[in-house]
Amino acid sequence: MQKPLVCVTLRGRTVEEMCNDAPKAVKLGADIVEVRLDLLWTSVEKMTSSGTDEGGNESIEVIVNHLELDAIDVEDSITTISSSIEAPILITCRPQSQGGHYPGSEEDRVSVLEAAIASNPSWVDLEIDIESSKREDLVKLAGKGTRVIASLHSLEATPSISEITQDVMDAQDMGDMVKACYHTKGRKDALRIFESALKLKSSDANYSLMGLGPGGDWSRIHAPALGQGLVFATTESGWHLSQQGKINASDLRIAWEVLEYS
């Protein structure tokens, strides 16, 4: 059974933090590392609230602040990232409309993606809803040297199995890999994603399906059996990841060994 590629999304909100996380990601089993350029325009504040959690510990509230567009030197950041990280890189610059943090206009974001592609990354993430002519130009710019992930992210409820599979089939000619991520509110939502991936296994689509929320990690853990081509993981660890639908890269590799997906 062929195992999917493992892509680890780098932690950090500065170029230095992301570059420092890359070797750890590779050590944990990453085939590819994802650089979320949109996170460069954010900073985090951690504030202690008056309440406590279930374990009696002080509750910590995390506040994400957005920086001004001109706070980041895009060209310099991309140059440093591409020269400092040895692993294959997936470049992403997610708009706020799809759960990302890029603060500028869509025209500005496309310019960031153009600069990113010019650095010759192994992969680039291009959302399927980018204006068609602009997206075609980006795909042409990527050429044969940079593979394209055609992505879609739903912040609403998880759709039906037929809708999920149709999403993937409709997008399969828009890139080398289709990434579809859905917000899960419970196990039933996660099961629909799981069943959709299983249904797609008999197709010729190259896909990566996942959920963000309870049960979202099912399609990641069982990705080899579901015919998935790529799985996203993290260097972060902790029990909270399961509720977020995420999984640590090392834990993912161990799970595949235990389940004999090799």
Features from the language model and the residues they span:
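Active-site mouth loops of central-metabolism enzymes
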Residues: Q2-C19, P95-E107, S151-S162
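Short, well-ordered coil/turn segments that N-cap beta-strands
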Residues: Q2-V6, G29-D31, I85-I89, N120-S122, ...
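Catalytic beta/alpha-barrel core
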Residues: R11, E34-L40, N65-D70, I117-K134, ...
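Acidic (Asp/Glu)-rich catalytic clusters
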Residues: P23-L28, I72-E86, E114-S119, R135-G145, ...
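Glycine-rich, proline-tolerant flexible connector loops at the mouths of alpha/beta enzymes
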Residues: I32-T80, E131
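Glycine/small-residue-rich loop that forms an oxyanion/phosphate-binding "nest" at active or ligand-binding sites
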Residues: I81-S82, I89-L126
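Histidine/lysine/aspartate-rich catalytic loop segments that bind and position anionic ligands
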Residues: L141-M177
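C-terminal alpha-helical cap/extension of soluble enzyme domains
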Residues: D189, A197-S262
